[in-house]
Amino acid sequence: MSQQVIIFDTTLRDGEQALQASLNVKEKLQIAFALERLGVDIMEVGFPISSPGDFESVHTIAQKIKNSLVCALARCIDNDIDVAAEALKVAKNFRIHIFLPTSNVHIQSKLKKNFDQIIDMTVHAIRYARKYTDDIEFSCEDAGRTNIDNLCRIVEIAIQSGASTINIPDTVGYTTPYQFGQIITSLYNRVPIIDKAIISVHCHDDLGMAVGNSISAIQAGARQIEGTINGIGERAGNTALEEIIMAIKVREDLLNVHTNVRCQEIYRASQVVSQLCNIPIPANKAIVGSNAFSHSAGIHQDGILKNRKNYEIMTPETIGLKDVKLNLTSRSGRAAVKHHMKTMGYQESDYDMDKLYDVFLELADKKGQVFDYDLEALAFINNQQEQSEFFRLKCFHVDSSSSEVAHASVKLYCGNNTYTHSSSGNGPIDAIYEALTHISKLSINLERYQLNAKGHGRNALGQVDIVVSYEGRNFHGVGLDTDVIKSSVKAMIHVLNNIWRAKQVIIQRKYIKKNNN
């Protein structure tokens, strides 16, 4: 009989560590809701002790998520565990995930301890965490390079101490599928009480073997897989959950396991993570890449026309990728727009219909026809804009025709006031950047500027993503328009508003702290 493999998503914890700019609470909630719709069993949503912002996001997500188990990370330190429990206590169900290094290189060079001390810390931390919940996961950090005798010993003691899930991470992506499978097999053969806990694996992709190692672990008996959407994460990333999920579905005949994930939500979740994290999906990415279901060779095309099974082991519809042909114009009503959003997998709670319809009409007047990719891009950008923006564009003008130096004039609403400034720069983007930073009086450095076409042809929308640094933190901004200069202006104003909101949060925290003392 087929057994369930638990899907543990750590996009919002391990995955977020790879981002140039941290996600805000609203963005994390959007990803959490996408994961809940996907049907992941567990979502690890942060490391609460690491910062007030992480605590706030864990607490907020724990309040909102109802159908997935919410988990937070903690070191084997009492205060870490206390803070994690405090952030999670509003959740319907929650798990505390604690970890300790178990390899000699980590124990000796990082912690300056011996293995017996690691054992003592493990026992204490698990027992301490069980004050808050019986759902405790213990991770043997760098298990892939841990002496197998030591690994078996600490796993047995962790289970005896009350851990309900034991995680075996290949922290640096060092092992091969055969080797990693042997590690899991050894645990099942040598730990007498192994059946009292669920064995989990968490594989990194440094050698490109994270998914292979995870599949090998399943074949050896692991029943929880940890990973991230699109495989994002530290260094080369983590196990790509969409690949694991579809490998289990397509090869259930071989693996004899299943997941409870709603596969038709895979593509939608992948797009949400890619857009919010500002990490493009490679065209040849398995499952969710734009070429994943493309066939260009003549022989392949002929075979597909005769029978899709000739060259497709799964269909795009399985992951929620539908061949939608939109023909929307400025004469299309709200019902038509809402229908096409539903066809693309959006729920009404994913977007503000009034705001979306306004920008749709604006775009339709410019382009004539609006296609599915246009509508999806509008919905994403529209959802990033807050109800109240401190900085708002009134108008701008750029002149770069007569010399190497470009000139820009920008008029900006700042709260209830209006300011205008003219600047010059090495190109129109630089000139606009100088004008906006002068008006905002924010000393920012542009770390990244990226332009992507959303659609096809000369009428394609241009999406600009920028990352700026301000007072030791990175902030992300995004803008969308058929005019790439205007997209750039919108992205810069978006990032200025993100910085302004972050400053307001800091002021509020200081005020609350002052009044609580």
Curated annotation (Swiss-Prot):
Q: Where is this region: Regulatory domain?
A: 392-517
Xref: Pfam families: HCS_D2, HMGL-like, LeuA_dimer
Q: Locate the Pyruvate carboxyltransferase domain: which residues?
A: 5-267
Residue ranges that the Swiss-Prot or TrEMBL entry lists as coiled coil: none
Give binding positions for Mn(2+): 14, 202, 204, 238
Record's catalysed reaction(s): 3-methyl-2-oxobutanoate + acetyl-CoA + H2O = (2S)-2-isopropylmalate + CoA + H(+)
GO BP terms: L-leucine biosynthetic process
Q: Tell me, in one coarse class, where this protein mainly resides.
A: cytoplasm
Q: Which is a Gene Ontology cellular component entry for this protein?
A: cytosol
Question: How the protein assembles, per its UniProt entry?
Answer: Homodimer.
What HAMAP family does this protein's entry cite?
Answer: LeuA_type1
Protein name, UniProt field: 2-isopropylmalate synthase
What organism, scientifically named, is this protein from? Blochmanniella pennsylvanica (strain BPEN)
Protein encoded by which gene: leuA
